Amino acid sequence: MTTVIENDSQKSGRLEVGTPLLEVKDLHVEFHTRDGVAKAVNGVNYSVAAGETLAVLGESGSGKSVTAQTIMGILDMPPGKVTQGEILYRGQDMLKMSNEERRKIRGRKIAMIFQDALSALNPVLSVGYQLGEMFRVHQGVSKAEAKAKAIELMDRVRIPAAKERVNDYPHQFSGGMRQRIMIAMALSLQPDLIIADEPTTALDVTVQAQVMDLLAELQAEYNMGLILITHDLGVVADVADKIAVMYEGRRGEGGPVADNYKHPAHPHTRRLLDS
């Protein structure tokens, strides 16, 4: 059993230069089904530091989203089960934390942007109510204060006429605007790390670029770590510092983006480049 001792930088909330914000170490996740055991993640390792962007690449079924859901603590268990490994946030293994400890990290310290904003947002609640809920739950502010903060967030992610649109519902926004609402929701409590799971898949090329530029700008402003999950190498070429290529639940290769573009070692990476 590993004993973790907090140092002064952890107590103060600061990390030493070069210290990973999040580390995934030898992670194994499997699903128990009627047909047997399906191994979804097989010994994945990667890390991300404050202000750094890690792109996790892979096709459907590669295990990239299962890894992200395990980090967030939102994977259904059962049927899912972590059989081995560590997920270290600021040196603390989240897999050994209680549900209450994980809940305090989720949203406050590590937030997630989901692929399908329309499904992730509640269709019967206004976007202002959903944005404000983060402040009401975690900060105990009044409804009026929560609404004001929601408008500020909508302005921050450049949703036009935020004050007039705060009471609108998700279906009244375009796909690009809904994704901006998801970004605003993730940013609401100024987390250390954001995990963006295919955040631009359903958007056209122009809107994709706008969303990625916005994410990069906000990341730099708040010095957040960013894990960008995607199957599209073109999306990450200009924003990622390093990549981790996943294939059949394993990390095929990784490292600085430029090195992997110029000298891809794994066949799957070459296929992604050619696609």
Description of each model-found segment:
Residues 1-274:
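ABC transporter nucleotide-binding domains
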